[in-house]
Amino acid sequence: MIRFVQIHGLQLVRHNSTISTISGKIQNDIRLMIDQKTPRAFLKQNSNSTKELVKILDVVDKPDEIKPIKRLLMKKFKQNYSPFINKLRDASENPTKLHLTYIKQIGQEYRVLFNKYIDEIISNNEIDTIDKKNCIYEMINLQNELYPTIGEKYGWFLTDKIHKWFWENIDKNESFTHYYFLIQNNVNLSSSYHILQFQKRLLKGSQLEFELASFQLFLHKPEYEHIFRRKFIILNSFDSIRSFVNLLIQKNDLRFLRMYFNSMLDSMKRPSFKTNPDTVEFDSRLNLIYFNISLLNYLSKIEDIKMFSSTLRILANETSKIQTNELNKDNKIRLSNISNLLLSPLSSSITLLRNKGMYDEAFDLLSLMRKTPMVHNSVFKNFLIGHLISCLRSFNDPKLSLQYVTSAYRRKRVALFLNQLGLWGWVYHGKSYTLSNQELDTEYQKIKNTLPRSMVSIQYPPLPVLTELYITVLNTFSKTMDKENFKVFLLDLYQRYKKTILPMRSHNLYFQQNTGILNAFLKHVRYSINDHLLSLTILKDFYNESDSHRFKPTDGTSPFSIVVYQNEKLSNRDISKVLELMDSLEIPLDFKFCVAMVYHYHSRNNIPEALVWYKKILDSKFNVEHMGLIKLITENGWEYPDHFDMKLLENLDEQKQSSTEEEDFLISNTKEDLETEAPTEATTDSEMIIKEFQAMISNTNHVLKKPLLD
């Protein structure tokens, strides 16, 4: 029998176990059969009565038929029920299935038998794939119908072998229906690698598939919310729920976030099927930290700095209680992973504080994190140092920034490196000057202990930190020097940078090169010196060097975009040279370069070629919010991109992009600058959520019955 279920406008097939249709008369026949004989008659060796009864039971497949029969047999045989079932099993043509169907109590024996039976189906070469799937579905549905209390309270756990068979034999297009069937039948969705593969596939699929995997499908209408409330935390692990929360925040879909956060808290209180008794306390502490990190993701998204700081203090307090020397290797790795998860929300919030000029608050957050065990993670430590140097940019004091970099990377070779780059001579001595080893050592000893040991790294400064230092130095000198002297300074610094960095082979900087520092040079050539042809000269000079192919643009802005964007000094021949260079380096076209090309040809009244470049933007599915480009699109009657926000047209007349805004378009959102994009407007009542989260935060410690690892 097949029943259809309507959810969210979608018709889904529900498989009920059935191979033959059995009349309700069977119950009466069985009743008469067992009433006419004593239990002993069925318990005798090779009992004909037992064989006759088994013939009937073997063809009864419908759960609604089985339930009253089972109750009838249990009432008849009472304490002899288990021996009676053993006799039935011995006489049955399908003994394992009969045993699973009529077993008295669910326990370890049942779970072993169930998985063994499914394994037998999978291994049976006489059954084709479709029939195997139907047989497995039949058993999954049967156990859920026969033992609903167990399924609703704990969920059913299938082995990874079973989920692997599904993964390898169910068509990708059937993933939605398969996953929905598992939800209907209370199958745990986080217990093994291959069921998580189904989950990942759906999360990366259509919106409907995403909503099924995340259970959001059941929240659109009140009549289906009970499915979410009843099944969500039973079938999904804490880690899965956490991943759903973070994905929804990333997608800026905040409509049902309160329910998801509440589910995270409820899940923390439930014992995990993967719980190791030796690490239960650490696991509880870790889950509380994970919860707070997800909360930080949300608070950074809605830019609530006050609540973000409060939550971060809770997280710092929790992590500071963990004694890392008591952890085994695996748990140290897990703790290290927390550092990586925290990078995104912390970076967003510190960047927001910097952009708002709230540097004291930014320094407070950095100071707070310095006291946690996460500073033992080199990536996290470099992250903190990078943002510290970024915040120091507000003081317009290159000496202070250089002092902190030298102290943070407390090795004499780092001071030698900065001396080779020319930064030490220009910053401390105001001229192109390379100090002798003795002079350098004297100055180095005075500043090397500026930062505490907990903030000291043994590496070279990573490129984001080095980029921040260059940005600070270039920005300050551009304001304190006249244009000609600044040009001399910049070219000297550029030549030293090129000669020092490009030949490097021996350490980590060689493997992490990007164009952040080159971008900073080119920005100042164009917007501080206003020598637009010089920017092209530097670009070609840099990429003519033998090792320059290692320097790839990052996700933000390429140096090619900086050179070409609204550069009226460039001829079509110059543009061709730039394109040839990009092609030889296999550098892909980004949105900003395409916009630059549209501007270039449009300013020369070559509308057809401008349209060609605009179509590249359309073909690449870039998100178009650049008001200058939108104005050109509107004036020329070009088609708007798919999913274009037509509300942007309302502000078109008010938009007059200044040169500063054009600079920001080119330089912002680069990884080298450690910037992140501002979030779009939240789609829910943030104040209401925050109030609930405040209550959550105050109650999270109650999840833990006692302080852990103090």
Swiss-Prot record:
Transit peptide stretch: 1-15
Q: Name one GO cellular component term.
A: mitochondrial inner membrane
Gene Ontology biological-process entries: regulation of translation
Tell me where in or outside the cell this protein is found: Mitochondrion inner membrane
Origin superkingdom:
Eukaryota
The segment annotated Disordered runs over 657-683
**Keywords annotated in UniProt:** Membrane, Mitochondrion, Mitochondrion inner membrane, Transit peptide, Translation regulation
Main subcellular localisation: mitochondrion
Q: How does it sit in the membrane?
A: Peripheral membrane protein
Q: Which residues form the signal peptide?
A: none
Q: Which family does it belong to?
A: Belongs to the ATP22 family.
Function summary: Translation factor specific for subunit 6 of the mitochondrial ATPase. Required for assembly of the CF(0) component of the ATPase.
Task: Tell me the protein's name.
Answer: Mitochondrial translation factor ATP22
